[in-house]
Amino acid sequence: MAEPFSIVTGALSVAALFNNCVTSFEYIQLGRHFGGDYERCQLKLDIAKTRLSRWGQAADINNDPRFAIDEPQDKISRQVQAVLEELEQLFSTLQKASKRYAIDAVQEDLALLQIEDMRPVARNLHSRLDAIVKQRAKKTSFFKKTYWALYDAKNFEKLVTQATGFVDDLEKLFPVKDARRLVDIEIEEVKEDEPSLRALQSAAADTDSVLAEVVAQRLATSGDENYIKELRNDEQSRVRLGSEWSASALGRGIGSLAPTKNRADFVVARGSSVTHIGNSYGGRGIFDD
């Protein structure tokens, strides 16, 4: 079981509150019940953290003197402080709920998934998003933290939904005028192969609309086009439409988004025949025996 993080009380500047909220995402682990959805859920947390850090960079929160004090004078800065305090309280509330759950849970249900359990594409995205955030936020020395866990989908959705809402509120107070440019930079810092972009697109849904939109546009304008106008095949034949990546190719990000077109007007597949309309990255494909 993960231990909860403890907070050293005391007055903090608005900037320190912001940095603490960003850092708090890094101490959340997910329980085994997330199973096959683990990668998407972990990336959702990463994207929520990245979006918060993006707002902080746009607001210049670590350099603007208005945010360097614990009792800001202007109205907007006080509103920012209030939102960040609510986000901080959300982390604390869910941590307490997890602690309560752990009291009666059997040991097996307290097993945790690890970043090492992720496949190469998702693990690489997690690492690169984390690196982006570390460039934007500062480490806080006011807090002693250890890892804690979310064990069920209900509290996970509560965290993501409410945290996203709080960032929405922050963006209304300090709009991210160059959000598109910052997102473009983020995408350039991750591998722009199709599997990575599709993983980002799935995880960004309902969490980061700007990121989801930019990824969708890149996929639409740069991805492979694979097409069969008419297909006739029997039960024994095997037909694959679409590009495929070997495990090693996924790990190295092989698969350029330079547009390719693979088209067939008419395909007849019979017996033990194998047909693949698309690109194959990294050597042997799914039909290679």
Where are these regions (language model features)?
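Conserved, well-structured core segments
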Residues: G10, A16, W148
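Charge-rich, amphipathic alpha-helical segments
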Residues: L17-F142
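Short hydrophobic membrane-inserting alpha-helices and related fusion/pore-forming segments
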Residues: M1-S13
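Regulatory helix-to-disordered linker/tail regions at the edges of structured cores
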Residues: E85-E88, S92, E108-D289
